[in-house]
C-alpha cells in the first residue's frame, strides 16, 4: 500500500480499511496494540491477532495513572525495545499510547491508526504526545 500523503517526510498517512492498512505497513516482528473498548468492539476480529492493551474512554483517562497501567501491561506482555506499539483510536488513545511508548524503556517504536477527525489532524501528526497532570493539559 502506498501512502496517500507524506507529512514533512516524517509521517506517512494511509487511508483505507483497517485490515488492509495493517497488513501493508506494520513492521516485521512483534506488535502490541493500545486501544479502547469502542475500537476493540468494532475491530476485534482485525486486532485479535495482536496482544492488546485497553484503556478507558474519555479525557479522564489521559493521566499518568493510565500510563502506569500501560507500563504494567507492557511488562506483563514482555514488551521490549524491538516491539512496535500501535495505537488505534482517537486523540486520547494516541496521546496516551504515544506518551507511554516514547517513555517506556527510554522509548519504543510506535505508530498510530487515528480513528477520529480531530485525532487525524492533531495528535497523530503533531509530533508530540502527553497526558494531563492534576487537571492541567
Language model: regions and residue ranges:
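ATP/NTP phosphate-donor binding region
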Residues: 1-84
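Buried hydrophobic packing segments
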Residues: 70, 97-101
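N-terminal cationic-hydrophobic initiation segments that often serve targeting/anchoring roles
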Residues: 78, 101-102
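Short, basic, helix/turn surface patches
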Residues: 83-88, 137
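Acidic-aromatic/histidine active-site loop/patch
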Residues: 91
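Catalytic nucleophile loop
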Residues: 94
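A glycine/threonine-rich phosphate-anchoring loop and its flanking beta-alpha core
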Residues: 99, 105-137
Amino acid at each position: 500500500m502506498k501512502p496517500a500523503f507524506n507529512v514533512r517526510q516524517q509521517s506517512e498517512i494511509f487511508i483505507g480499511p483497517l485490515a488492509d492498512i495493517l497488513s501493508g505497513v506494520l513492521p516485521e516482528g512483534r506488535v502490541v496494540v493500545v486501544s479502547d473498548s469502542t475500537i476493540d468492539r468494532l475491530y476485534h476480529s482485525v486486532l485479535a491477532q495482536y496482544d492488546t492493551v485497553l484503556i478507558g474512554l474519555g479525557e479522564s483517562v489521559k493521566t499518568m495513572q493510565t500510563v502506569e497501567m500501560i507500563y504494567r501491561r507492557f511488562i506483563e506482555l514482555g514488551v521490549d525495545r524491538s516491539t512496535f506499539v500501535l495505537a488505534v483510536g482517537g486523540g486520547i488513545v494516541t496521546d496516551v499510547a504515544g506518551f507511554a511508548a516514547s517513555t517506556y524503556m527510554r522509548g519504543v517504536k510506535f505508530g498510530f491508526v487515528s480513528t477520529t477527525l480531530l485525532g487525524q489532524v492533531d495528535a497523530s501528526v503533531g509530533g508530540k504526545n502527553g497526558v494531563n497532570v492534576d487537571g492541567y493539559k
